[in-house]
Amino acid sequence: MASELGARDDGGCTELAKPLYLQYLERALRLDHFLRQTSAIFNRNISSDDSEDGLDDSNPLLPQSGDPLIQVKEEPPNSLLGETSGAGSSGMLNTYSLNGVLQSESKCDKGNLYNFSKLKKSRKWLKSILLSDESSEADSQSEDDDEEELNLSREELHNMLRLHKYKKLHQNKYSKDKELQQYQYYSAGLLSTYDPFYEQQRHLLGPKKKKFKEEKKLKAKLKKVKKKRRRDEELSSEESPRRHHHQTKVFAKFSHDAPPPGTKKKHLSIEQLNARRRKVWLSIVKKELPKANKQKASARNLFLTNSRKLAHQCMKEVRRAALQAQKNCKETLPRARRLTKEMLLYWKKYEKVEKEHRKRAEKEALEQRKLDEEMREAKRQQRKLNFLITQTELYAHFMSRKRDMGHDGIQEEILRKLEDSSTQRQIDIGGGVVVNITQEDYDSNHFKAQALKNAENAYHIHQARTRSFDEDAKESRAAALRAANKSGTGFGESYSLANPSIRAGEDIPQPTIFNGKLKGYQLKGMNWLANLYEQGINGILADEMGLGKTVQSIALLAHLAERENIWGPFLIISPASTLNNWHQEFTRFVPKFKVLPYWGNPHDRKVIRRFWSQKTLYTQDAPFHVVITSYQLVVQDVKYFQRVKWQYMVLDEAQALKSSSSVRWKILLQFQCRNRLLLTGTPIQNTMAELWALLHFIMPTLFDSHEEFNEWFSKDIESHAENKSAIDENQLSRLHMILKPFMLRRIKKDVENELSDKIEILMYCQLTSRQKLLYQALKNKISIEDLLQSSMGSTQQAQNTTSSLMNLVMQFRKVCNHPELFERQETWSPFHISLKPYHISKFIYRHGQIRVFNHSRDRWLRVLSPFAPDYIQRSLFHRKGINEESCFSFLRFIDISPAEMANLMLQGLLARWLALFLSLKASYRLHQLRSWGAPEGESHQRYLRNKDFLLGVNFPLSFPNLCSCPLLKSLVFSSHCKAVSGYSDQVVHQRRSATSSLRRCLLTELPSFLCVASPRVTAVPLDSYCNDRSAEYERRVLKEGGSLAAKQCLLNGAPELAADWLNRRSQFFPEPAGGLWSIRPQNGWSFIRIPGKESLITDSGKLYALDVLLTRLKSQGHRVLIYSQMTRMIDLLEEYMVYRKHTYMRLDGSSKISERRDMVADFQNRNDIFVFLLSTRAGGLGINLTAADTVIFYDSDWNPTVDQQAMDRAHRLGQTKQVTVYRLICKGTIEERILQRAKEKSEIQRMVISGGNFKPDTLKPKEVVSLLLDDEELEKKLRLRQEEKRQQEETNRVKERKRKREKYAEKKKKEDELDGKRRKEGVNLVIPFVPSADNSNLSADGDDSFISVDSAMPSPFSEISISSELHTGSIPLDESSSDMLVIVDDPASSAPQSRATNSPASITGSVSDTVNGISIQEMPAAGRGHSARSRGRPKGSGSTAKGAGKGRSRKSTAGSAAAMAGAKAGAAAASAAAYAAYGYNVSKGISASSPLQTSLVRPAGLADFGPSSASSPLSSPLSKGNNVPGNPKNLHMTSSLAPDSLVRKQGKGTNPSGGR
């Protein structure tokens, strides 16, 4: 390069060209451009940006030598530098790049390296320095200087040392001076994402005032630095430019100003550049070139090594293929033999399993056929029910069309419901065989025509019967009129039923013979009933209770008599409780009607029946017009009622006809009557049977020729078909639509606004302690497991279980109502025993007893007693000089004299009693004296006083202390007048704030029944008799206490009170008694206990709440109806009414009909009767009790409609007061759940418009169990039961797993023993071949090879299971390898292996090269990637005893696999054949998801009977292989003797052994 530059400067003189290889080398190693760019970047001066012309500034630094070579050499970098500096000074964008990056881009990159987000004015100079290129130039310059290793002058060394000392000085100063610590993180904070400089400064300096002072100090320091810099500049004129430049850089570090623009940059000389270049070349030659050469050599050696390894592996594979080909030729015959043996085993197992499985499959097919027949019968019954409903709908449509004069637009829609849209059904049975059930022959058009014909015939028959009845009635009436005209008592009115005067839609006025004013809705109801009568249609008047159904019926009969001249006979049938009400209403509103009350005893009814003459009926002068009777009497006297042709039959409370199988329903249906009217306050029943019953009753013509529906409900087909819900939802709604034209229902809130309001209040009562004990005792006897088991039983068991459970429910309800219902408290007395007296002889009495009443002896005993007063005196005050101790020395310190001591011990019980009283009295004074009266100076005395030995007073629990301290009074058993048994926690409830609080350690008194406890046995004390007069006297004195005064003190407390006690009856204010008479019990001294009436109230929470409620209601002037379901409870309520002196009346099922009328009338007319006790069933129907304004349900009924009827006895027309209904409910008991169920029942009634009688016996066992158990308790028990069941299943699973392991181990052991025997006998075992990677499924001749499989099942997640003892398919496993079982769970995870291109398979074009449906390239080989033999094993060791063992294991596993495949195939074939034998159409095109996928025809070859899908359970344990004998996918074998490849290609489906 130097030569070229020199030639260019000499004026273009030519030089010889260098050799070509030198030019290539120079061109490859040319670094001119790189060096220029590097020098421009690193040699640029810091102040180059401030200079105007970089080129001019750089020229003076060039050496002054006039060598043009040096100038030319230095010119390019200087010009480049000048261009760079010029561009920088002009403020334009840099046009050159620094290492390929623009200068503006480098500044942006530098800005990204620092955090300038919180940078303020004081640190702006750091930003300019960090973003400028000066630091890089200085660093590059310093690096160049270091590389050049220039020798430092003495002055430069001194400067460096001075700067180092200066630096250390300021570092020490910074560390000591706390004010300088504010500059911590001054520049280091810019390198972090979070700049802590200002936070540190604020922490050290505090407020801003201090900062201002610091800034002033800083400015002063900066002035000093500037002055010092000026002095250095003056001195620098004598120093070298290098030192000056170094100092400016140093001062720039301590100041905010850049170095002055006058400084010049020093440039290197040519010699220095050449030396640096030579140094770089030496480094390249010495270091880089040898390193590159070594890397190339190592790479070549590695390549050669890999090539050798690859060649070795290729050689080994080719050798293995050759060996394998030779081995295949030898093993062809043994393989064929083994194949034949396995096929024989396969068919043997096939036939065995087929026979066994066929029997089981035939049994299953028979059961399936029975089930299909049952389903078909259920479907037929359902179609029959649909046919009957459709037929009834058509009949109702004809009737309503006639009545409403409508058009025939709904007929086709009704008939369309007979169409059957069911399709052919397929069922997957256990074996996976698809069964096609044959379609039944159902012609919807035929049934449509049949239903239409039946409905039209029934309609015409009904019309004909109506006309016939009218004609007969006309003739009977004419005959009666002729007879009356002859006698002159009749009238000449003519009437024709054929031409009625009333037309549909005409408004009918109120009859004039009706005394009263009908309301608007009642008049509409009468018009509707009259219209039904004209058309000959029966109807149901289902107005809500209390709206006047009775009045509307009477008005209809009055209308017929007045407008149509039909005076009967009319038959009214009602419950026994409303008979008198009907009689009263007829007498009140239509007095012209002659009403015949048909009830009483048989003799009375016989007398009444004398007026039943057909000749005298049908006229106004008939002996009777209306007959009123009850349902019971109709059934009893049915033969008499059937003789009369009734014009109108009215059935009150028609819900009694809910069952079509009842005798009452059948009898009433046989009556001869023109029209029937059903009155019911409850809606239509909510079961299909009850709806059918009502339909049949109001439309008997339609069902006279049909008996199917009776059989339908007797067999309970709905539950048997198990589709009851569908029938209920669809057909139940259709039945309601059928009844709609014949039913009229209004409710109170829609038609009547004059009725007062009705308020219902739930009163929750707490159980008493006695009730809780009984309730819990009953609950403890219940076995929840038995309940759950009984509730889950069959339908036959449900009926028996429900009755027993309902009995249990009634016991709980009894306890809730009153414990007396469950266990009545009777009068109780102990067992009294009279002991025989003991007879004592006179001699024994006189001489045998120690103490007798002998006064002379007693006197001497008192004189000689040690307690004699003179003896005590002598012992205390003995003579002087005798120092004897006395046993009575303590008397002087307890304040008792010798005489008092003698009286206490010798004068008897009375004296001791008096002494005890005086001592207790004195103890009070002594206690007060010791507590309050002791002076301070006498607190320490020397001698004892006369009361110092009375220490009992000082005891904390002494009687005076207990009486004076209120805390000690409350101690247990510290007082004789309190029955405190302990301290316990009490919950205090506050009614106003509805809160409760717990108070601990409160006094707990003994229960009252413990205080009046009576002994079980009592007896008079044993008495003795003696044949001695003195003995009797002494016995009498002893019984009286020794003296009369003692007796008086014991009984009366004092002798003075005895006279007052005897004269107490004559005194107006007698003195209170004392002694034993004052503590006489309330019930006397006798132990006989008679339960009080107060306990009758307090023992029941409900009765206690009722007592409080009745007291309040009586004071406010209300009158009350009390309903209860239990007559025994009404008996208890009667006892309560007598005890509280409430006037009451009682009506229940035992009341006579005549008495009921009088009781209702008395309650309505007499205001002094406060309470009416009624049973819910007997007193809740039909009667009018509007005099009462309060209804109390002591217990709720199962059916909410029954309670609704009962409360409507008071809330009905005529009630002017507000009616309040109270319902008593025991909290937390079975009654809450019964009430909840009743609410759900009423909600269903409102939704479906179908209410009805809810009988307890219709409850299911599960529903009764839900009443007995709480939801939480039931859930807890069920959870425990499920947990126990789960644990039991887990235990059984473990046992089953253990049993299978033992069975498998035993089987394995037997197989091993069998193999050992065969080995000893010398049986030739054929070692199976190990196929190579190239010819996996081919023999030497290209034949398909048989692949045997392991009999063990694979992992459920594995795709391939490869055993070390059985190498399947094309897995190239080394015989000497010790690898064990390999399970590949994900074939996609293994990398595909490349195959050799020179394999025989690829040459011959084999079609099948897969194992288990997976290509060999996708299967990881056990031996692939390893050497031909295992480590440490010599060559040629592959055929060892271990290999023989492998062959034996393979043979056994292959046989077991064949047997298993044959068994499964036989089972599949047996199942298909068995179902086909019972008439099922078995489809051969079975989907892949079927569990058993096999053809039903026995195959002629091996490829015809195998499974056809990889997902079949009959496939191989290698789950996708299907490698079993007979698989058409893998057993594409031909004879081993046919080497032709054409035969191999066309050999699919052929049998090498010629079939079986």
Swiss-Prot record:
SUPFAM superfamilies: P-loop containing nucleoside triphosphate hydrolases. The modification Phosphoserine is found at residue 1512. It catalyses: ATP + H2O = ADP + phosphate + H(+). Pfam families: DBINO (PF13892), Helicase_C (PF00271), SNF2-rel_dom (PF00176). The modification N6-acetyllysine is found at residue 118. Residues 1-266 are annotated as: Assembles INO80 complex module with putative regulatory components INO80E, INO80F, UCHL5, NFRKB, MCRS1 and IN80D. ATP binds at residues 543-550. Although the ATP-dependent helicase activity displayed by the INO80 complex requires INO80 ATPase activity, it is likely that the helicase function is carried out by the other components of the complex, RUVBL1 and RUVBL2, and not by INO80 itself. This is Chromatin-remodeling ATPase INO80. It comes from Homo sapiens.
